[in-house]
Amino acid sequence: MPVVLAEFIDYSLEWLRCESLPFPVLNFDVWNNIRGSNLHLGPCFDQTVPGQKLTLPFLKRFTESSGIADGFDCGTLVQRRQLNNTLNDSSCQDLAAKTGEILGMIKRTLARTRSCSHASIEWSPIVEKACLDFFSPGNLQRFLLLFWSGWYPNSPIIHKPTFNSEAEPPGLIASMAVLGACLSPDSNDCVRAMAWLTPVEEVVFADNILYDDSIIASSNLVGDEAVVWDKLKALHAAYFICIAQNWEGSKEGRQRVRKDRYSRIVSIARSFGLYNLSLAKLDTTFSTQQKWARFILLESMIRTATYIYLLDSAFVLYYRLPPRVISLELNTGLVCPEVCFQAESAAECFLQLHMATMGKQNQSSLTVSSAVRLLCSPHNLDLSIFHNLSSFNMFTIISALCCLVFQYQTTLVDVSQVTPAATGLSRWKWLWQRGGHIVVDSDGYSVENMWKRVGFMQHANEYYHLACAMLERWKLTEKQIGDTLAAWAAPVGSVQGNPKYDDGEMVQVKALIHDMENMTY
């Protein structure tokens, strides 16, 4: 391990020695003794049980896995095999027209972009047959089922109860199918999916509606604006193919997603107006089909904006890429409870919405940026406004706090200036422990209901530990900080082993997680 990195990790692990299990908190004496700091906090958990180790099962698996199925919560191999027993022959035939649409779309796009294509595919009768075979009606049904049951809980941005695969754009169906195929228990499906990652990527990013800046979303939409829906679905297609390409594609494909394609997605979402949406003005007192349509559109856009931010924050934390979405520009409202978004009817949805918002009027006005600001505030705060936030919302907030810590690492800040992050982390942990959040294994769900489970967001507490370990670097004295910053400022490639940016192999975060898990305290 590089010398400088080892020194960082040694210091960053000091906090573990004074932690409680299973919910560590910061060693607040560090912050209370900072000269000029107004932060005065105290630990609110019991002391450490000697000899125990911190475990970070999700982060360890995520950083060491080689693909989506192994790295994320996508159900067990047995569950994904059982999905084949739920296939319906009549549904297969209904998707025959979609197979033809996907074939025509890919063929036209590759012919049009042949001179500048990344796909390296020369269209021929053999390629056409392979395309028809991979996107056949039967395969589409299987792959979409794998998408819903395996991947969907990790990014529930589409309203499944009203989703109609026969009526959806071919680009979206192709993107979802490729991602679903990557989760197939049949290795042949996975291998064939690799061949179609880049062609589908080119198809969805060639959709002109993505770049139409005249289409702008707002909280005043009524829910039936076709052109807004079309752009949102095109954005979903681009998002899903980026997920598949980044975790299953070639080295070139992964780099293209992280450096180019995802920057486009962020820019498109920004010009689309997705970072300023909220359900605060939605009347939940009684249900109508029109209000349900409005809810579905607005909540889908809010979730899309949030997940675009979450993937960007993952690129920041794991690959040390500069952030493209700033936490404080994310003025989207917090997402609604999953039972509301999963409801099968307007009546059920609005009943759940009414119950969720009853007595929590102020919570509906929270945005991601305001939540982070409040938690990091030096002033006394009534935390009841955050009462019973979902794992989804808590994960979004801890991701923002992690990115805040990362930004400290890349600037020459004085140690007294990092107290907002320490405050935010301590308050977040207090809320998490009192929110009744537990990790639920996918085995507890029937095959038919796997799409309703909570995805990787339920492991948000592991991100808290990671943020604390990173933040402890500022526990050093003024002189030690100066020495550390001098080492970080060494020229790229120097023998000191300075931190690497655009770390495609996640070397540094893997090393940090390894050392955290192997320290006994």
What would you call each of these model-derived segments?
Residues E168, L172, K233-H236, S300, ...:
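Structural signature of alpha-solenoid helical repeat junctions
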Residues V454-K479:
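C-terminal substrate/ligand-recognition segments
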Residues M1-E168, S175, L179, P199, ...:
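Intrinsically disordered, low-complexity activation-like regions
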